[in-house]
Regions:
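Signal peptide-directed extracytoplasmic domains
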Residues: 36-73, 93, 98
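Mid-length scaffold segments of soluble, non-membrane domains
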Residues: 63-141
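A structured, mid-to-C-terminal "fold-capping" secondary-structure block
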Residues: 20, 118, 123-174
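Helix-boundary and loop/linker segments of multi-pass membrane transporters
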Residues: 12-13, 74
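Post-signal peptide N-terminal segment of mature Sec-exported envelope proteins
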Residues: 14-44
Length: 174
């Protein structure tokens, strides 16, 4: 009886994390990449560029993400959120010099961040297993696919000039 109880306590793989061995390796890689590359680059970026410039760059990319949030809000039937995102984009793109200045926040127009992973969840797509993505960190299979779609539909990805596209991608990551 004791022998059977001991065997009964042996655990198999966690059903919510069937990719655990791979996830652990990717997490170790991400930790190393963060320590060796990403953090030093971010520190230099912070030391070289004044706060106002960094804020403007962040606002610019935030304005671009508001465009996709608008479409995802519509797809999730969140019409009020879609309207607010449309107002944010209109105000920040025109009055905010292409989004560099975030007037919409100053005007108390709430940001409603929605992505394609959330849209798939809204329409009943299950999350799938937990996965750790290189450089991006923890996610689910559904949200990983959503991240791929978000990236492919990103405004910057539509640029033909590879150097400009790569520069904007690098700036967004910092």
């Amino acid at each position: 009886s004791l022998l059977l109880q001991g065997c009964a306590s042996l655990k198999g793989p966690d059903p919510t994390d069937p990719l655990e061995p791979l996830n652990r390796k990717v997490t170790a890689f991400n930790d190393m990449a963060d320590d060796v590359v990403l953090r030093p680059v971010a520190v230099i970026y912070g030391q070289v560029l004044p706060t106002v410039v960094r804020k403007g760059i962040g606002n610019f990319f935030s304005n671009q993400s508001d465009v996709m949030s608008f479409f995802n809000s519509l797809a999730q039937l969140k019409l009020q959120a879609a309207a607010k995102n449309a107002m944010r984009v209109g105000i920040n793109t025109t009055l905010g010099l292409g989004g560099i200045i975030d007037w919409a926040t100053e005007l108390k127009i709430d940001k409603h961040k929605e992505d394609f992973g959330q849209t798939m969840a809204f329409w009943g797509v299950s999350s799938g297993p937990y996965v750790v993505l290189p450089f991006f960190g923890p996610s689910t299979v559904r949200d990983s696919f959503g991240l791929y779609i978000d990236n492919k539909t990103d405004v910057n990805q539509q640029l033909k000039d590879t150097a400009a596209k790569n520069t904007l991608t690098l700036l967004r990551l910092t």
